C-alpha cells in the first residue's frame, strides 16, 4: 500500500490546487504584516494628528471630569488664581471707590465754600450800594447798575463841590437838612438833565 501511495502519480490539477492553496497561506503573513503596519501607521497618524488638539481636548475633558485628581488640583489652582485675581480687582475697585467718594466730598465742600464766599461778597457789596443809592438823588426811570451808581455818585460829588464853591445856599436852607437835601436833589436832577449847573434856574 505504501508503495502504491508513493508511486501513485500526482495529477497536475491536484498539484496546481495544492500550490494554489499553499500560495495564499504563504502570502497571508506578509499581508497580515502589511495590514498591521498600516493599522499601526494609521493609529500613529491619528494619535499624532490629535496630539496637540487631542491633548488640549483631553485636558479640557479632564478638566470637566471631577474624578481625575491631577486635573482636579489644576482646576482648584486655576479657580484659586481666578478668585485671587477677582479679589485683587475687587480690592482695587474698593480702594478706587474709597478714593472717589472722598474726592467727590472734597469737591462738594469746595463748591459749597465757594458759594458761601460769593454770597458774602455780593452781600457786602450790595449793602453799601443800596445805601449809596439812597443818598444820591435818582430819577424814577433810573435802573442803575453798580458802575452807573458809582459814576452818578462821582457826578453828585462834583455837583456838591460846585454848590459849596458858589455859596448860593442861604442860611435858612442850610439850617434845615431836609429842605437842603430836597433842594439839592431837585437841583442835581435838573443838572443831570441839562448837563450843567445853572444857578439862575435854581432861583
From Swiss-Prot:
Entry keyword set: Activator, Biological rhythms, Developmental protein, Differentiation, DNA-binding, Myogenesis, Nucleus, Repressor, Transcription, Transcription regulation
The function of this protein is:
Acts as a transcriptional regulator. Inhibits myogenesis by sequestrating E proteins, inhibiting trans-activation by MEF2, and inhibiting DNA-binding by MYOD1 through physical interaction. This interaction probably involves the basic domains of both proteins. Also represses expression of pro-inflammatory cytokines such as TNFA and IL1B. Regulates cranial suture patterning and fusion. Activates transcription as a heterodimer with E proteins. Regulates gene expression differentially, depending on dimer composition.
Gene of origin?
TWIST1
Family annotation (Pfam families)? HLH
Identify the InterPro entries for this entry: bHLH_dom, E-box_TF_Regulators, HLH_DNA-bd_sf
Q: What assembly does the database describe for this protein?
A: Efficient DNA binding requires dimerization with another bHLH protein. Homodimer or heterodimer with E proteins such as TCF3. ID1 binds preferentially to TCF3 but does not interact efficiently with TWIST1 so ID1 levels control the amount of TCF3 available to dimerize with TWIST and thus determine the type of dimer formed.
The identity of this protein, by name, is Twist-related protein 1
Tell me the compartments it is located in. Answer: Nucleus
User: Where does this protein have compositionally biased stretches of type Basic residues?
Assistant: 34-43
Domain (bHLH) spans: 109-160
Q: Where is the composition biased (Gly residues)?
A: 46-65, 80-100
Which cystines does this chain contain?
Answer: none
Q: Which organism is it from?
A: Gorilla gorilla gorilla
Q: Where is this region: Disordered?
A: 1-107
**Gene Ontology CC, one term:** nucleus
Keyword Glycoprotein listed: no
Record's compositionally biased regions (Low complexity) = 1-18
Amino acid at each position: 500500500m505504501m508503495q502504491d501511495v508513493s508511486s501513485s502519480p500526482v495529477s497536475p490539477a491536484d498539484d496546481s490546487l495544492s500550490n494554489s492553496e499553499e500560495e495564499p497561506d504563504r502570502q497571508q503573513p506578509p499581508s497580515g504584516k502589511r495590514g498591521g503596519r498600516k493599522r499601526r501607521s494609521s493609529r500613529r497618524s491619528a494619535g499624532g494628528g490629535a496630539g496637540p488638539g487631542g491633548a488640549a481636548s483631553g485636558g479640557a475633558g479632564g478638566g470637566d471630569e471631577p474624578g481625575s485628581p491631577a486635573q482636579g488640583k489644576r482646576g482648584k489652582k486655576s479657580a484659586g488664581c481666578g478668585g485671587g485675581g477677582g479679589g485683587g480687582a475687587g480690592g482695587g475697585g474698593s480702594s478706587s471707590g474709597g478714593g472717589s467718594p472722598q474726592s467727590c466730598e472734597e469737591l462738594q465742600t469746595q463748591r459749597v465754600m465757594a458759594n458761601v464766599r460769593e454770597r458774602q461778597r455780593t452781600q457786602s457789596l450790595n449793602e453799601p450800594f443800596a445805601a449809596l443809592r439812597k443818598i444820591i438823588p435818582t430819577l424814577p426811570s433810573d435802573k442803575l447798575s453798580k458802575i452807573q451808581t458809582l459814576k452818578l455818585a462821582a457826578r453828585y460829588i462834583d455837583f456838591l463841590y460846585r454848590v459849596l464853591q458858589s455859596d448860593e445856599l442861604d442860611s435858612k436852607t442850610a439850617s434845615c437838612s431836609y429842605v437842603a437835601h430836597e433842594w439839592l436833589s431837585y437841583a442835581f436832577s435838573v443838572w443831570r438833565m441839562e448837563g450843567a449847573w445853572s444857578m439862575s434856574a435854581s432861583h
